[in-house]
Amino acid sequence: MENQNNIHRELTSLPVGKLLWKYSVPAIVGTMVMSLYNVIDRIFIGQGVGADAISGLALTFPIMSLAGAIGMLVGLGASARISIVLGQNDKVKAEKILANSLVLSLSFAVCYLTFFSVYMDDILRSFGGSDRTIPYAREFLIYIMPGMLCTNLCYSFNNMMRASGYPGKAMYTMLLGAFSNLILAPIFIFWLDWGIKGAAIATDIAMAISAAFVMIHFFNPKSQLRFHRRYFKLEWGILFNIVSIGLAPFLVNVASSVINAIINTSLYRYGGDEAIGAFGIFNSYATLVVMLIIGLCQGMQPIVGYNYGAGNYTRMKKAFVLTGIVATICCTVGWIGSTFFPYYIIRAFTTDTNLIDVAIHGMRIVMGVFPIVGFQIVTTNLFQSLGMASKSIFLSLTRQVIFLIPLLLIFPRIYALNGIWIAMPVSDTIATAITLLLLWRTDKKLQNKNSVITR
């Protein structure tokens, strides 16, 4: 009870800037670590195995994104609800959400693994794979998929650990896995000469270590929230709330997977395996920046959700505005790197000169309006944190589905390979304009609740 009261005082009275720093830094570390697993694999594989291997690894990105989508569906949906009910001082309901989330996460993971294990080759072929690249993709997936269960648990419950008042512990748990992967990957790839399967096995072991520490936390009687056997009985109302709120980030990742599959297919048609590899490289860089913003939003989420539940709208506004400013700065820095220093970024992944040239050209175009992306992501997460699932889902789909898919179907017919690159920044620009409009309209509707979201 004392710990719960301390968390209440912290979230409702600590200066917002200091609070956002406290919650965001661990969250950023967590999301960056998740991205670094993929980046580390790509760097070591690109340098140690070759250009075809890195193109093959790019084929697995949609499948890996879907695994992350399941983690977000449960983890972010549950953590948003936990923050709100803790703001309402309802610990029992928070622990019911926690227990139901474990059952839901395990069920989704088993279904996912079964499906992709059965249809792996057909899926890779539909994603733009060729006879040169599919063997590498298949080998990586065969070894990485058994570890997906741990990845799901780690990602889902790391968010809940943060939402229940343990941001620092959540950060250290993720760092433990990242350092393990950083040590094991070069040993398995180079020293043991396991190649691409070595990268997968290293990631599996690292995620298992992180997942074990997360689970130990929630079985610890001293934790703010913990598992109770009596709460593992599924409650449909709780499941609906988790899924409805988590649906937005889930759809973002599903959309990302679908878009990546469409992009890979188009890239193979207009640019061959090199174009797929190039996109895989600079998409890894862009994903690092985006995941930094996602971590920032996860740090914002308990502050916004808790104060929304407590009726403190002024603090909710301050957290949102500050998060938006920091996100824009981060995306601008990412744009500077992609525009002025692309060679050094791409060179870290490969020494193949043709691949480097294709990647530099595409990177500069795709990330051309990157500074505006942060605001769009933060606003989408604001609606998610407030439990406004429909708005969050809509904004999630505008950037990666509603506008991008038609552009990807039209532009390449006119501009060939450049058309694929151009479609992405055009979609980002339109989606951001829609986001501004929806934020303004929502604020007008919330005036009766003393809303100050955009003032």
Predicted features along the sequence, with ranges:
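Helix-loop interface residues and adjacent transmembrane-helix termini in multi-pass membrane transporters
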Residues: 36-39, 48-51, 85-88, 163-164, ...
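Short alpha-helical transmembrane segments in multi-pass integral membrane proteins
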Residues: 1-24, 82-147, 191-247, 304-369, ...
